């Protein structure tokens, strides 16, 4: 039986390894036929090349070390604008094919300003010892070098190379727990990760991370599952939720017990769960052949892609590492059966292949000459751009100034390349005259609407409350459009695309909150006939409380204006290429003109028009995405279900993430705050003719929030399934995840239709901004100006209100310009965080005023300030989810207010100012 197995092994080996000319990749076959390898490789287009990204290559000065060759497996990275390359190895004397000796180096080379055409390499220092095959990561201080080998033993040393006057300084960092070489590593999310490799020739499955720059020792992570991986490629990239460590490819060496193999899959380590999981097999979309990433290098691109450069051909490499084992097996079989001619023939063939392996020209080895791209959210692989400059293994890859710099590596086994190549991938945005026509027509129409209502205005009451002429259904749509904003239109689809539907129950809480708002809050605003919501706080508590609350509201509204100005500008920049700052300025100016002219009546009717555009655009997008997914409706449902995109609830009791309990508590609190203390919303309650109409408008908004919002989450799931089945249609350089929906509009929809959906984003923005500006003008005019000048006429108040519109809009625009420089992964999360931080205390004041008659002005202010302080402390000192900030602030304000009500006792006539008093009055 044993002999039969040996013969079977020989037959398989012969089939895999027969004929040195038989193992030739498709590209090499074409190049052999054409007689020009470089041109053949460079000219062949890739089926997956997309229409949105361009790839350009440029050569930097060549780097030769120890002779005429470059080096393989060096440490490389950036320090103060200079490219540093340290260590590495090559064969400076006799070629490897002739038995030459591999030499390891300790020299450090520097290329100042790699983007300049005039820079040249210079020797800048030396490593503590000669090393190669380690890990290098760039940090703000310089280049961190980890592990490696000197050719005799593995190293556990970790040190930082810093550029300074006089040369390169080497600073020791915490050493690895074990010596490692041929591993992979990356930095991201505050950690340096290392995994795989070997220790003095023995394969390792160990994984470690170092909290940089604070930790004094490495943390042991769970071992990588499956076999060990030598020479894998690694990167840290966001998966839509958190930064994860991706470990791709690599190989398991052959030994006496089993053949070696090159991995065609990858692993991902999630720091939140502290578990490894597998990613999709490395099969580029549209192909059927698995690839490996042995000897490849990796860097992140945009917010969710990883770019891989170089690496060996799986079949050729796997045959090479198994050939010695096949020879040994054949020799053993021949010892037992010396006269077996078949075995002799197989052995001779194997030995010839082994002898000839290092002698072939570089194209024969079929090193990967394409950019291999992985998308973390859809878990898909594509290839983009083919160039012979990419066909290297063991090269270093360094990111700098929007370019990826490939340094050295080997062009074939034993032969090092001195080439240094910069790769730049860019996005080709184009808006088109048809889209511009639709967008400009919409903007002009909104300005004309504002002008029309300006002509109808009679006094300040018309400007602030529309004279009570607004129908209930228009007020309801206006509330919905105001609270919707571009945040919902872009960020909710982006959130569902990257994660799932767990945020949807938060929108259901809007309907749940509508019932207590109608019963307990609305009567006060309507029956007291207030213009500003904060007038109630003065009547209930004191003037100080009113002024503080109004001032805080104004601050929050200006911050919100900035955010919702930034969002559509970000979208327009991503799809048209127009400068982000110009977009912000243009959007702000158009919105200021529109809402300043028409007052609240123009705002409300503008919201109605914009709401129709918003909803219509969303419903159309859902249909297009679902039917555009391969398999249509069934494909959409199947792919979305398999990926968990329709998950509604996370039942875990984790206060740090968006679990069901966090969503419900946070949603109830945040929406209660918005619908009971936000002048923008309350002002809509006051524009209707009576309290009954106001109740109907609130309920309509709640129902629209529940049912129409399904479309936004369906868009997110549809974006996932569409790009899952069309991964080459993505923009590989997309920097902000929130631009995925507008990118889809511009990349997939025809001219004009795309402009209409982009106009819907502007509609969402303008409805919110105009409402915010009008409400700020109302609060400032009524709560401050009228207080300082109680004898001011209606005309004077109207002038102040209009000037306030202009000034507040300009301030919001300025903050939006500043916000454009911030790193905000999810604008939805950022907005909810700001909402909780700035407005939770306001909701607490109204809650205390209406339901707790014993709480007076001093106690209420104490509770209010305590709530704000506690929320800031929770944010900075705990990992609590931002969704709970509003709930924490609300509860803290009320509890502290109750406690201090026993200290600050106040007597005041509360008739008509508390719920119990109002209920008693109604009963009479």
Name these PLM-found stretches.
Residues 13, 32-431:
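Kelch-like beta-propeller repeat domains
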Residues 7-20:
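Bacterial N-terminal signal peptides
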Residues 19-36:
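Signal peptide processing junction and immediate N-terminal pro/mature segment
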């Amino acid at each position: 039986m044993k002999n039969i197995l040996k013969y079977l092994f020989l037959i398989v080996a012969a089939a895999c390894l027969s004929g040195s000319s038989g193992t030739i990749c498709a590209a090499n076959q074409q190049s052999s036929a054409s007689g020009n390898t470089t041109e053949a490789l460079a000219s062949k287009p890739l089926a997956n090349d997309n229409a949105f990204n361009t790839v350009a290559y440029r050569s930097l000065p060549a780097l030769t070390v120890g002779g005429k060759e470059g080096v393989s497996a060096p440490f490389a990275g950036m320090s103060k604008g200079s490219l540093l390359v340290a260590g590495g190895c090559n064969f400076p004397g006799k070629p490897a094919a002739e038995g030459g000796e591999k030499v390891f180096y300790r020299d450090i080379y520097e290329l100042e300003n790699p983007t300049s055409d005039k820079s040249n390499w210079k020797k800048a220092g030396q490593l503590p010892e000669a090393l190669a095959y380690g890990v290098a990561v760039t940090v703000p201080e310089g280049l961190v070098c980890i592990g490696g080998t000197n050719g005799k033993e593995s190293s556990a040393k970790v040190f930082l190379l810093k550029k300074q006057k006089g040369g390169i300084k080497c600073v020791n960092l915490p050493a690895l727990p074990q010596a490692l070489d041929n591993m992979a590593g990356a930095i991201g999310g505050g950690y340096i990760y290392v995994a795989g490799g070997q220790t003095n020739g023995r394969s390792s499955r160990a994984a470690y991370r170092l909290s940089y720059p604070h930790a004094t020792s490495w943390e042991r992570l769970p071992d990588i599952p499956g076999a060990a991986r030598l020479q894998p490629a690694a990167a840290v990239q966001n998966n839509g939720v958190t930064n994860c460590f991706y470990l791709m490819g690599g190989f398991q060496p052959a030994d006496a017990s089993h053949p070696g193999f090159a991995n065609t899959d990858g692993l991902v380590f999630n720091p939140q769960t502290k578990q490894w999981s597998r990613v999709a097999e490395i099969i580029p979309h549209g192909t059927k052949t698995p690839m490996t990433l042995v000897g490849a290098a990796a860097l992140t691109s945009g917010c969710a892609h990883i770019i891989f450069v170089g690496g060996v051909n799986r079949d050729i490499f796997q045959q090479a590492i198994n050939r010695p084992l096949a020879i040994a097996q054949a020799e053993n079989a021949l010892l037992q059966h010396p006269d077996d001619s078949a075995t002799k023939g197989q052995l001779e063939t194997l030995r010839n292949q082994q002898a000839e392996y290092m002698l072939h020209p570089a194209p024969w080895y079929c090193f990967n000459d394409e950019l291999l791209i992985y998308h973390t959210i859809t878990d898909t692989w594509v290839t983009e751009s083919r160039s012979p400059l990419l066909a290297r293994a063991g090269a270093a890859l360094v990111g700098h100034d929007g370019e990826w710099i490939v340094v050295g590596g080997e062009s074939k086994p034993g032969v090092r390349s001195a080439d240094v190549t910069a790769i730049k991938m860019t996005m080709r945005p184009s808006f088109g005259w048809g889209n511009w026509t639709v967008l400009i027509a919409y903007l002009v129409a909104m300005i004309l609407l504002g002008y029309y209502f300006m002509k109808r205005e009679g006094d300040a009451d018309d400007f602030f409350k529309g004279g009570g002429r607004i129908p209930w259904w228009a007020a309801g749509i206006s509330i919905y459009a105001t609270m919707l904003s571009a945040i919902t239109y872009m960020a909710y689809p982006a959130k569902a695309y990257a994660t799932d539907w767990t945020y949807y129950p938060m929108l259901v809480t809007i309907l749940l909150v509508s019932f207590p708002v109608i019963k307990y809050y609305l009567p006060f605003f309507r029956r007291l006939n207030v213009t500003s919501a904060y007038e109630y706080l003065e009547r209930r508590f004191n003037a100080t409380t009113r002024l503080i609350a109004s001032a805080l509201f104004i601050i929050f509204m200006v911050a919100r204006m900035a955010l919702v100005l930034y969002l559509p500008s970000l979208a327009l920049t991503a799809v048209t290429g127009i400068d982000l700052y110009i977009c912000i300025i243009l959007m702000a100016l158009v919105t200021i003109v529109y809402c300043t002219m028409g007052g609240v009546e123009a705002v409300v009717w503008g919201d109605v028009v914009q709401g129709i555009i918003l909803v219509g655009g969303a419903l159309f997008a859902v249909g297009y995405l679902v039917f555009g997914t391969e398999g249509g409706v069934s494909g959409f449902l199947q792919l979305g279900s398999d990926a968990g995109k329709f998950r509604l609830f996370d039942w875990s009791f984790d206060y740090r993430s968006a679990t069901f309990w966090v969503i419900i508590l946070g949603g109830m609190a945040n929406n209660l705050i918005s619908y009971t203390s936000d002048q923008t919303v309350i002002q809509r309650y006051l524009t209707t003719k009576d309290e009954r109409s106001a109740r109907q408008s609130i309920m309509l908004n709640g129902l629209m929030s529940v049912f129409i919002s399904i479309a936004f989450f369906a868009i997110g799931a549809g974006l996932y399934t569409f790009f899952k089945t069309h991964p080459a249609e993505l923009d590989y350089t997309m920097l902000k995840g929130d631009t995925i929906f507008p990118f889809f509009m511009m990349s997939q929809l025809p001219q004009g239709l795309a402009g209409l959906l982009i106009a819907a984003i502007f509609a969402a923005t303008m409805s919110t901004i105009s409402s915010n500006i009008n409400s700020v003008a109302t609060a400032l005019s009524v709560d401050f100006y009228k207080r300082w000048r109680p004898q001011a006429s209606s005309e004077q108040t109207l002038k102040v209100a209009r000037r306030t519109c202009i000034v507040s809009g300009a301030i919001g625009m300025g903050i939006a310009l500043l916000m454009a420089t911030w790193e905000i992964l999810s604008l939805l999360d950022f907005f909810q965080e700001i909402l909780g931080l700035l407005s939770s205390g306001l909701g607490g004041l109204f809650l205390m005023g209406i339901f707790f008659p014993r709480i007076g002005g001093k106690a209420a202010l104490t509770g209010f300030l305590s709530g704000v302080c506690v929320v800031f402390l929770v944010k900075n000192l705990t990992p609590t989810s931002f969704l709970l900030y509003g709930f924490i602030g609300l509860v803290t304000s009320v509890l502290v207010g109750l406690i201090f009500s026993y200290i600050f006792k106040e007597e005041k006539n509360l008739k008509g100012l508390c719920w119990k008093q109002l209920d008693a009055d109604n009963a009479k």
